[in-house]
Curated annotation (Swiss-Prot):
Binding-site residues, Zn(2+) 1: 70, 72, 85, 88
Positions bound to Zn(2+) 2: 814, 889, 896, 899
GO molecular function: DNA binding; DNA-directed RNA polymerase activity; magnesium ion binding; zinc ion binding
Biased composition (Polar residues): 1387-1399
Family of this protein: Belongs to the RNA polymerase beta' chain family.
Disordered: annotated segments: 1387-1411
UniProt name for this protein: DNA-directed RNA polymerase subunit beta'
Cofactor: record remark: Binds 1 Mg(2+) ion per subunit.
Amino acid sequence: MKDLLNLFNQQRQTLDFDAIKIGLASPALIRSWSFGEVKKPETINYRTFKPERDGLFCAAIFGPIKDYECLCGKYKRMKHRGVVCEKCGTEVTLAKVRRERMGCIELASPVAHIWFLKSLPSRIGLMLDMTLRDIERVLYFEAYVVTEPGLTPLERRQLLTEEQYLQARQEHADDFDASMGAEAVYELLRMIDLQSEMARLREEIVVTGSETKLKRLTKRIKLIEAFIESGNRPEWMILTVLPVLPPDLRPLVPLDGGRFATSDLNDLYRRVINRNNRLCRLLELSAPDIIVRNEKRMLQESVDALLDNGRRGRAITGTNKRPLKSLADMIKGKQGRFRQNLLGKRVDYSARSVIIVGPNLRLHQCGLPKKMALELFKPFVFAKLQRRGLATTIKGAKKLVEREEAEVWDILEEVIFEHPVVLNRAPTLHRQGIQAFEPVLIEGKAIQLHPLVCTAFNADFDGDQMAVHVPLSLEAQLEARALMMSTNNILSPANGEPIIVPSQDVVLGLYYMSRALENKKGEGMVFANTSELKRAYDNSVVELHAKVKVRITEIETDDQGLRNKASSIVDTTVGRALLSEILPEGLPFVLVNTEMTKKNISRLINSSYRMLGLKETVVFADKLMYTGYAYATRAGVSICIDDMLIPLEKKEILGEAEQEVLEIQEQYQSGLVTAGERYNKVVDIWSRTNERIAKAMMDTIGTEKVVNTDGEIVDQKSMNSLYIMADSGARGSPQQIRQLAAMRGLMVRPDGSIIETPIKANFREGLSVQEYFNSTHGARKGLADTALKTANSGYLTRRLVDVTQDLCVVQLDCGTAGGLTMTPIVEGGDVVEPLKDRVLGRVVAEDVLLPGNDDEPIVTRSTLLDEQWVAKLEEAGVQSVKVRSPITCESPFGVCALCYGRDLARGHLVNMGEAVGVIAAQSIGEPGTQLTMRTFHIGGTALSAAAIDNIAVKTSGSVKFTNLKYVEHANGTLVAVSRSGEISVLDTHGRERERYKLPYGATINVKDMAEVKSGQILANWDPHNHPIVSEVAGFVRFIDFVDGVTVIEKTDDLTGLSSREIADLKRRGSQGKDLRPLVRIVDKKGNDLTIPGTDLSAQYLLPPRSIVNLQDGAPVGIGDVVAKIPQEASKTRDITGGLPRVADLFEARRPKDPAILAERSGVISFGKDTKGKQRLIIKDADGSEHEELIPKYRQIIVFEGEHVTKGETIVDGEPSPQDILRLLGIEPLAAYLVKEIQDVYRLQGVKINDKHIEVITRQMLRKVEIVDQGNSKFLNGEQVERQRVIDENAKLIARNELPAKYNPVLLGITKASLATESFISAASFQETTRVLTEAAVRGTRDNLRGLKENVIVGRLIPAGTGQTYHSQRRYSSVGLTESEMETLVGRSTSSGTEITSPSKDAIPLGSKVGF
């Protein structure tokens, strides 16, 4: 008994463990957990309320109800500890053992565990190699199964119906064994010899030819291997004894009124016990077979319901028709154990209240109501009251506090002095949603919040609430102060830009004071310094907006780092000069000598942070805010209805538009345009008109005519209140002003299509009834969308966090030479993102050389590029830089600091232990709610711009062709005959300024390397038709042109010219099925010509709907158009935009009709078509051919004889990321994902750093597929964690054996989360049952590496400050010293390169980074 007691005392200490293993419980193990068998279904006695003996709450089995007191009351108190009462059988011990002691039920007949039966793929089915349907028939007593065939012709595991069984019995008497129910399955499982079965399967897999059989065999081998390795036995999947949960985990609570509230589990257990007992009695009475069978089936069903109610058949419901919550339901879903209790816990010492603005707070402060503070800091106050001798006991102190005596407030002031509190606003979408502040006691009941942190919290003061938490321990206070203080979170982790940026009224005030106006009082005065100017302003000698000259003194730092004063007389305004007074030393006056719009203020704060560091910036931000508020108050900006100026030209513009619409209507009625064209054109006209009126309106509102000092009338930016607000970025946008004063424009129907009648009125004029009705359409859709968007965006964030949660910075340098090559992002000729923005804060992977000089590196390998370096690169005209990336990082777990680069929120190299995965997930998920949900239809307002049909240069320079194939036309122009060709404009230094894609068939007006002037047109093409260009000169010969079958002759009514259109396949009838209309180019004698450089004849296959304007036998020259394909058809694809698009990319979903990419490089030719498919052949350099069958409705965008490279698009569509990975490799895949995701966010004006997307891509590429197992233990086609294969291969190579070969696999984020090594993390994410079943069979061990697993087991997370704790635990258990540990963790880089960084934040190597 003593040992038993010690056992429990040991259990009270928290166990120290490094990993958690899950497995199947054997009957012996279940019995060893049990403290007695539960024999009766009774719970408690309704009169005495004491638990029944041997019942579900029995005290003898589960322990006493009161501490150290047996049930009958014979033994009480500590002195009898450990005694078992002979009367009631209760052990005298703590009552809390009722939370940990289990019971058991001995089942009269074995029962299959539903998880291993029904959780697909069925483990029992796989193990026995039987279908689930068959096993269910056996288990639920519908069929017999042969367990031992003996010498009979029957097979083992053969199913027999009742008739077949009786017949077999007659024929073979007792020579064979067959039975039904779980006993039969148990027998079959028990007979399996895993080792010999394994050997048999391994032999079979070598000889098998069928693909499906191979898959099944592989699955079985993996399962049997799992059983062998984990030491589980197959028959343990059948339960012979059922464990019973401790009673305090399924409590029975008395309610007032004599009723009881009970856990559903008790009902489920009662059913099992009742049926089990009845079955025992029936077996004792040897009842008829059919009754016993029925009872056994009912027992099986009740155990199924207990384990997972509703998994099979109808769910068992309670009294109120609600399905009962089974054991499986307890752990899964949002309300389950994992997500409700382990990952989300309630916190003590917290409060919540409404927030109000605190404009006089400093950035690190928040106002805390006195009442709230007193409650939160109670324990500290009690302690201090006692220490001061104001109260002798805690009780006394409590009384003092309750009475709110005067001294209590003094002590509260002392207690909260420099004790940070943590504020949080739900939803916490990124780490800026929780920040620490120093409390300031205030009257009232609302929390005061500093206005500058509102952006980070996404808070406003329209009734938002926030929660306050108190960090108690010293470490917690330290972390709150050092890491979470609002002053330490100035930059956003998503893009490294300041998040502490003034908004709204502050911006308005700063903008107002920095505006310059003509002819104001005091214009032209000169001041000796700002204080003189301030005197003049205070005495109303000059006005705030007057243009004056002032002597400004600045501090400049020279090359040697010495600080010198420099004075100069500057043209400025009174307001800007006043603003310069709050400018910290070291910031140039130029930064404020401009209109202070929101963008400029952000730039100012950013420069301050980079140039002066954190402390100065925080002080400066506060000063900016105070100044902004002061001048906003003085400005007294207000709006009235007359501020909405309606442009005079509006009437005229509307008249013109209505006239154009009428003309199109007439054209439509006379049949010149189709309904679709008419609709598109009308929508186009109104979009254009809206733009014109809006422009006129902005000109009217934005400028005013004034008289300057010379008496001339000049235009100046107006001080119209509406315009000021929009222009400064304080509130509103030109779009909204357009609705107020120009016209509302086109409205959208709920399905995303556009209503073609626009709302011509604006809000000032007021809407007509019809217009109002039309506008409710779109408005209501907007509201509905927002509601749906929030849920979708939250789910995306959850998946992202789950896939990256275990990714931290684990070492300084992994020593890889790999990386990604960064180039500027160019769209439609404009550089959307210059190179400097893309490489800022990254580490260079290989030396960057000066363009045109290969000996002199500008930047050496392993340099962290900060602002200064990036400026140098830009000066030198570097066009591409290879930088380290998380995708190519070779750290076994996590990433290394150099591959990650700069910590965007701190501005220096990332610290060890930073949880970069979660930060990436938050940065991508947080703006999710700003993305749209809708799918754009082509030709909506989304793309209402007119089609582009030429390239006009924006800057002068020289032209460079890239990847461009072209032929020279007789008239001297060039015609493009390639698809991936690009044309760039370089400046005098050879830097690329613009880049454009050239479509096939474009006419190019310049030669390579020619000089061009700004505005010159380089190339033009027909945007509505795709031409087919002849590459040889000769004569046209039509092949398979049959009038009325393959071609339709059309004559234009207006011009009288005839053209031939190739008929659609569906219209051709039977005789035209095998005809392939094509145009062949022949010489004078009629011999075929070949395309230069190939042996293919010059012939062009004509797709349906293409139009030929030439006659048979007509001459063609090089570069002439043989035929054209109208482009309307292919462009009706919807563009999935916004959130769904981002989700599709991260889930790596294949698009509906994916683009078909060339499987290899070679020359295109077309083979014989099959039914409904076209045959495309690629012949590579060594003459081998690759065939591709393509459905007829797909648009092939390559022609006969064209040369394609591997991975190039040959059939139009959205490329599938899997294809890009397979054909082009990891780097192009990364580039594709980053580009596509960034496009969506860029459209919404959201900036996210590329590296966050790369971090997620890294997690999507964690697995590899084995293509050749070599001598490894992996199976072909198996998906394995990359690191495991690398480790295994290293061992094999060391033993001189064949390593496994593998290909990378791209998994979507949901799949990747579920395929993680940690089963705890996967189970708490989704599909809990499936994950746990799989893990139990495998006997998986969870090494608790990620953040989630550690939160669940209640430990510090292995990131940030918790990483030190973890590494110490790990190494102290191995017995390493501190210095040995340091070398292991890798403080120095493995490749011996030093990180250089010219900024003052340089980190010397060998120093501890971070905390």
